[in-house]
From Swiss-Prot:
<keyword id="KW-0071">Autoinducer synthesis</keyword>
<dbReference type="InterPro" id="IPR011249">
    <property type="entry name" value="Metalloenz_LuxS/M16"/>
</dbReference>
<feature type="binding site">
    <location>
        <position position="128"/>
    </location>
    <ligand>
        <name>Fe cation</name>
    </ligand>
</feature>
<dbReference type="InterPro" id="IPR037005">
    <property type="entry name" value="LuxS_sf"/>
</dbReference>
<dbReference type="GO" id="GO:0043768">
    <property type="term" value="F:S-ribosylhomocysteine lyase activity"/>
</dbReference>
<dbReference type="InterPro" id="IPR003815">
    <property type="entry name" value="S-ribosylhomocysteinase"/>
</dbReference>
<comment type="similarity">
    <text>Belongs to the LuxS family.</text>
</comment>
<feature type="binding site">
    <location>
        <position position="54"/>
    </location>
    <ligand>
        <name>Fe cation</name>
    </ligand>
</feature>
<dbReference type="GO" id="GO:0009372">
    <property type="term" value="P:quorum sensing"/>
</dbReference>
<dbReference type="GO" id="GO:0005829">
    <property type="term" value="C:cytosol"/>
</dbReference>
<dbReference type="GO" id="GO:0005506">
    <property type="term" value="F:iron ion binding"/>
</dbReference>
<protein>
    <recommendedName>
        <fullName>S-ribosylhomocysteine lyase</fullName>
        <ecNumber>4.4.1.21</ecNumber>
    </recommendedName>
</protein>
<keyword id="KW-0479">Metal-binding</keyword>
<comment type="function">
    <text>Involved in the synthesis of autoinducer 2 (AI-2) which is secreted by bacteria and is used to communicate both the cell density and the metabolic potential of the environment. The regulation of gene expression in response to changes in cell density is called quorum sensing. Catalyzes the transformation of S-ribosylhomocysteine (RHC) to homocysteine (HC) and 4,5-dihydroxy-2,3-pentadione (DPD).</text>
</comment>
<keyword id="KW-0408">Iron</keyword>
<keyword id="KW-0673">Quorum sensing</keyword>
<comment type="subunit">
    <text>Homodimer.</text>
</comment>
């Protein structure tokens, strides 16, 4: 099985909250695709609550589009990581890490403005696979933590696992 890009970086050295360019690709038609690692908490040290990350999934996707989409950027998808330490965001375009960090912080401010659970988009049995597994309070706690900490940048060159370490794993 091929070694995926996300497993060539040292998770013990990742800062959080932080943005990292996980991958750049160019489609056969010449479109630039960028995948970002939006690391909410430090791997193996903290984890996002199940209900909080699920509610963020519903809110974050729309708010990030509000703040980042434009003439040269269009978000394709934002999905939570299975390890529950962050989200992956795939988009058309090549925004800077700072642009992404600023949009992320603005999105967290938007999460804090949601007043009631009923305002969470697609919160019903027809559009959500576990529509009862949500917590606006937990999502807002996560948002407050991100705003308080600020968002830094993780660089692949700083996190790259050596061939020696990879060979032992």
């Amino acid at each position: 099985m091929p070694l995926l890009d996300s497993f060539t970086v040292d998770h013990t050295r990742m800062n959080a909250p932080a943005v990292r360019v996980a991958k750049h690709m160019t489609t056969p038609k010449g479109d630039a695709i960028t995948v970002f690692d939006l690391r909410f908490c430090a791997p193996n040290k903290d984890i996002l609550s199940e209900r909080g990350i699920h509610t963020l999934e519903h809110l974050f996707a729309g708010f990030m589009r509000d703040h980042l989409n434009g003439d040269d950027v269009e978000i394709i998808d934002i999905s939570p990581m299975g390890c529950r330490t962050g989200f992956y965001m795939s988009l058309i375009g090549v925004p800077t890490e700072r642009q992404v960090a600023d949009a992320w912080l603005a999105s967290m401010e938007d999460v804090l403005k949601v007043v009631e659970q009923s305002e969470i988009p697609e919160l019903n049995e027809y559009q959500c696979g576990t529509y009862e597994m949500h917590s606006l309070e937990q999502a807002q706690d996560i948002a407050r933590n991100i705003i308080a900490a600020g968002v830094s940048v993780n660089r692949n060159d700083d996190l790259k696992l050596s061939d020696e370490i990879l060979g032992k794993l």
